[in-house]
Amino acid sequence: MATLSFRNVKKTYAGNVPVIHGSDMDVADGEFIVIVGPSGCGKSTLMRMVAGLETVTEGEILIDDKVVNTLEPAERDIAMVFQNYALYPHMSVFDNMAYGLKIRRLPKDEIRKRVEAAAQILELGKLLDRRPRALSGGQRQRVAMGRAIVREPKVFLFDEPLSNLDAKLRVAMRLEILKLHRRLNTTSLYVTHDQVEAMTLAHRMVVMYQGVPEQIGTPMEVFEKPASTFVAGFIGSPPMNLLEVAVGGDGIVHTSDGIALDISPLAVPQQVRGRKVVMGLRPEHMLLNAQGLAAEIEMIETLGSEQLVHGRCGKHMVVVRCSTRQFSETPARVGDTLTIGPDGRHPLHWFEADTGRRVEGL
C-alpha cells in the first residue's frame, strides 16, 4: 500500500495543446479515489501519467513521497486494469495471470501461490485451465483484475474497466471491485465517465472538467453541495435543474424570462437577494402540484416505480422525479400545464451567474 500525490501536474501535447491545466491532490494509503468526468476532460490522461504511459509536462507525481516522473512503468510498482481485457488468447487463465510474474522471474512456487490466492478471491479457481474464449465477459474482466492482484502492487489503476460490459454485468462487477478493495485495502485510482460507478465505489470523487479537478470530495459531499453548475449538472440522474433567476431584495424570485416563482422568501438566503444568480433544484426534491412555477408537460418517462416528468417553464426545461404512486394522484398528460416546486424539505442551491461557482457560504 502507498500514498499517491499530485503536485501542480500539467500535460501539454505537441502544438502547445494543454490537456491537464494543473492538478493538486493527495490520495491516502488504502484510499479508493474515482476520477469522473465527460469525454475529453483529461481523466484518462491523468491516470496514464501515473502509470508512466504519458510524460508529465510540468509538476510532480509522487508514490510514497517518491517522485516517479522519470521512472519507467515497470519501476513504479503499480498495476493497471484496462477497459479492454488484453488477455493472451492462446494462454490459459493461470498463464495469463502468471505471465507478469514469470517475466519478473519469481520462483514457480511463489507464482502458483499468488495465482491460486487471487483466483480464490475472484472465484476463478475452477477456470484456471480455460482459455479466454471459453469465458464470459465478466469472467475475463476478473482474470484481468487477477493479473493485477498477483503483482501485489502499491497502487491499483483502473481505466474504465467496466465499459465493455452489459448493464447487469456492470452492477455485478461493481460489487466485485468493492469487495476486492475492502479485502485488499490497496490504494486505488479508478477512472470512469459513469457517475453511478463513481458514487458507489469512491471514498472520494474527483470531478474533472476541461483538464482541471472541478471538485474533490466524498460522493455525498459532491451530491449535496456541488461546487459549480457543471458539477450540479453532471452528478445526479437526472441532473439538477438549473434556472437563471433574478432575486429581489425582498426574496421574491423571477426567472430570467420574467416568470415569477411562488417560493417562500424564507427559502431565499440573504447572500443572493438583490442579485442575478442560478438557482438549482434536484428533480427528486421537487413535487407536482406544489408552490413554485407553472410548467407545460412535454414528456413523461415511465421507469416502473418512478416517473420523470419533463416540463417547460419559459425558456427553461425542468424535470421532476416522483414515485409512480404520487404521479397517479396527478392525472397529468403531455400538453397539460401544472405547477411544480421544491418540496420544502431540502435546501435550494445557488450559483454565481458569471462564474458558475457555488455562492460562498451556501
From Swiss-Prot:
The keyword Metal-binding does not apply. The complex is composed of two ATP-binding proteins (UgpC), two transmembrane proteins (UgpA and UgpE) and a solute-binding protein (UgpB). GO terms for cellular component: ATP-binding cassette (ABC) transporter complex, substrate-binding subunit-containing. InterPro entries: AAA+_ATPase, ABC_transporter-like_ATP-bd, ABC_transporter-like_CS, ABC_transpr_MalK-like, ABC_transpr_MalK/UgpC-like, Mo/tungstate-bd_C_term_dom, NA-bd_OB-fold, OB_MalK-like. It is found in: Cell inner membrane. This is sn-glycerol-3-phosphate import ATP-binding protein UgpC. Its EC number is 7.6.2.10. ATP binds at G37, P38, S39, G40, C41, G42, K43, S44. Residues 4-235 form the ABC transporter domain. The keyword Transmembrane does not apply. CDD domains: ABC_MalK_N. Part of the ABC transporter complex UgpBAEC involved in sn-glycerol-3-phosphate (G3P) import. Responsible for energy coupling to the transport system. SUPFAM superfamilies: MOP-like (SSF50331), P-loop containing nucleoside triphosphate hydrolases (SSF52540). It comes from the Bacteria. Belongs to the ABC transporter superfamily. sn-glycerol-3-phosphate importer (TC 3.A.1.1.3) family. It holds the Pfam family ABC_tran. It comes from Bordetella parapertussis (strain 12822 / ATCC BAA-587 / NCTC 13253). GO terms for molecular function: ABC-type glycerol-3-phosphate transporter activity; ATP binding; ATP hydrolysis activity. It catalyses: sn-glycerol 3-phosphate(out) + ATP + H2O = sn-glycerol 3-phosphate(in) + ADP + phosphate + H(+).
